[in-house]
Amino acid sequence: MEFPVLTVNPAKIETACLVVPVFKDGDLLPAADKLDDASERLIGQLLDRGDFEPSLGNVQLIPFAPGLGAERLLLVGLGERAKCGESQLIKALDAAFGAIAKLPLDDVAATFTDVPVGERDTAWKARVTLEAAHRACYRFDEFKSEPAPAPRLSSLTLLVGDEDQAAQAELGARVGAAVGEGVSLTRTLGNLPGNVCTPRYLADQAQRLADGADGALNVEILDEDALEALGANALLAVGQGSAEPSRLIVMEYRGAEDPEEAPHILVGKGITFDSGGISLKPGAGMDEMKFDMCGAASVFGTMKTVLGLKPRINVIGVVASAENMPDGRAIKPGDIVKTLKGLNVEILNTDAEGRMVLCDALSYVERFKPASVVDIATLTGAAIIALGHHASGLLSNDDDLALDLLDAGENAWDRAWHLPLWDEYQSQLDSNFADLAHIGGRPAGTITAACFLSRFADAYPWAHLDIAGTAWASGDKKGASGRPVGLLTQYLLDRETEAAETRPSVE
């Protein structure tokens, strides 16, 4: 999608449709005011007569726009000015572009950058505008025999007030477009059925990403023979009941001037289907366990975004992928497995398999001497009980890293909530038969899952994002959300800014 930024009078812009946000209090925003003057108070009259109610998310298409360069206007309600925050703007954007996606339009223009949203600047508003456009145009219909017509939108022009705003808008739109593409890839991988999206399929997707990266991405695939030689028995144990072989996928992007600069590493849980194994899940809703690889999908999506933005830091994406199935060879409750780190783990419930593939991946990445490691996983139902479907759970062994991730989530409006990782919880993992058990009972399930992972992440700053409640939606809108690509991308961009400030200047 193209995203030109212009400073022209909105009344003169030639476009198939001009999207105009309107507050409920009747005071028009600067762009809408200019349009109103040029069209003999078209917008004002609609509001005065009650023909358009600018409640939050309400939209109305005006098919003819006399006196204006635009062929059509799309009015979108912002609700009350005093209540307009980030969530309200994003809801209005989703409503506007949801309507646009249903129309036969190739190009539109929008004036959302003049909407006041707290202390958010033009760059942020441009970013979320592009993200919303990509979100609305996303379709997953490759298994539909007669798919609906795809949205035609290919160009979104952002209208701003002056050149200073234009520079900010261009920067924000570039990030928003890249995040939008990364989110779309994440959603597609998550939405694919388990008989298509297998560990081998994910490995192929990594190679495909590298093939289109002009040498910017190096990929290494560790198959089961390599994993066995390595000693990654926890990862292998999860997949040993499946006909689908497990994989460890490593994607390396070296964007820093020094290729040996400590990388930031993302580790994704890639359980391409989770039946629960011998500890079999209930049948109702088991189809949604294809989404148990959404952590891995978010790593793919973030790496795609990184390739689009080319930050000057080193980033490594690692995906630990397996299929968890019941079989005569499958792991059983009571089994003890020796991990890559050398710790012996007692398996108490085979449906707690994500932490097993992750623990070996966390041990593996130690060889890169990372600046930070963030793992992303649909790990615990307890995270949904604690946080619902709005915030991802965040736990970390490093308070500075946790704060950086929280800040990134607030900036990207892809938020997380910090939970404690206190030593007092560790005793719940005590085992009579092994070095530790891999689950700690019902109390504090999200925390004890992170406690388990922390045993394998003690050599570097590490954080864990539990996205069980945010990775996908159920019901009529069932599908992968693409989260937390926005948070992860912002975290990496912030690390690029931080690195630029600390690198010695060259004279």
From Swiss-Prot:
<feature type="binding site">
    <location>
        <position position="353"/>
    </location>
    <ligand>
        <name>Mn(2+) 2</name>
    </ligand>
</feature>
<keyword id="KW-0963">Cytoplasm</keyword>
<keyword id="KW-0479">Metal-binding</keyword>
<feature type="binding site">
    <location>
        <position position="274"/>
    </location>
    <ligand>
        <name>Mn(2+) 2</name>
    </ligand>
</feature>
<dbReference type="GO" id="GO:0005737">
    <property type="term" value="C:cytoplasm"/>
</dbReference>
<feature type="binding site">
    <location>
        <position position="274"/>
    </location>
    <ligand>
        <name>Mn(2+) 1</name>
    </ligand>
</feature>
<dbReference type="GO" id="GO:0070006">
    <property type="term" value="F:metalloaminopeptidase activity"/>
</dbReference>
<keyword id="KW-0464">Manganese</keyword>
<comment type="similarity">
    <text>Belongs to the peptidase M17 family.</text>
</comment>
<dbReference type="InterPro" id="IPR043472">
    <property type="entry name" value="Macro_dom-like"/>
</dbReference>
<keyword id="KW-0031">Aminopeptidase</keyword>
<dbReference type="GO" id="GO:0006508">
    <property type="term" value="P:proteolysis"/>
</dbReference>
<keyword id="KW-0378">Hydrolase</keyword>
<dbReference type="InterPro" id="IPR000819">
    <property type="entry name" value="Peptidase_M17_C"/>
</dbReference>
<feature type="binding site">
    <location>
        <position position="353"/>
    </location>
    <ligand>
        <name>Mn(2+) 1</name>
    </ligand>
</feature>
<feature type="active site">
    <location>
        <position position="355"/>
    </location>
</feature>
<dbReference type="InterPro" id="IPR011356">
    <property type="entry name" value="Leucine_aapep/pepB"/>
</dbReference>
<dbReference type="Pfam" id="PF02789">
    <property type="entry name" value="Peptidase_M17_N"/>
</dbReference>
<dbReference type="Pfam" id="PF00883">
    <property type="entry name" value="Peptidase_M17"/>
</dbReference>
<feature type="binding site">
    <location>
        <position position="292"/>
    </location>
    <ligand>
        <name>Mn(2+) 2</name>
    </ligand>
</feature>
<protein>
    <recommendedName>
        <fullName>Probable cytosol aminopeptidase</fullName>
        <ecNumber>3.4.11.1</ecNumber>
        <ecNumber>3.4.11.10</ecNumber>
    </recommendedName>
</protein>
<comment type="function">
    <text>Presumably involved in the processing and regular turnover of intracellular proteins. Catalyzes the removal of unsubstituted N-terminal amino acids from various peptides.</text>
</comment>
<dbReference type="GO" id="GO:0030145">
    <property type="term" value="F:manganese ion binding"/>
</dbReference>
<feature type="binding site">
    <location>
        <position position="269"/>
    </location>
    <ligand>
        <name>Mn(2+) 2</name>
    </ligand>
</feature>
<feature type="active site">
    <location>
        <position position="281"/>
    </location>
</feature>
<dbReference type="InterPro" id="IPR023042">
    <property type="entry name" value="Peptidase_M17_leu_NH2_pept"/>
</dbReference>
<feature type="binding site">
    <location>
        <position position="351"/>
    </location>
    <ligand>
        <name>Mn(2+) 1</name>
    </ligand>
</feature>
<keyword id="KW-0645">Protease</keyword>
<dbReference type="InterPro" id="IPR008283">
    <property type="entry name" value="Peptidase_M17_N"/>
</dbReference>
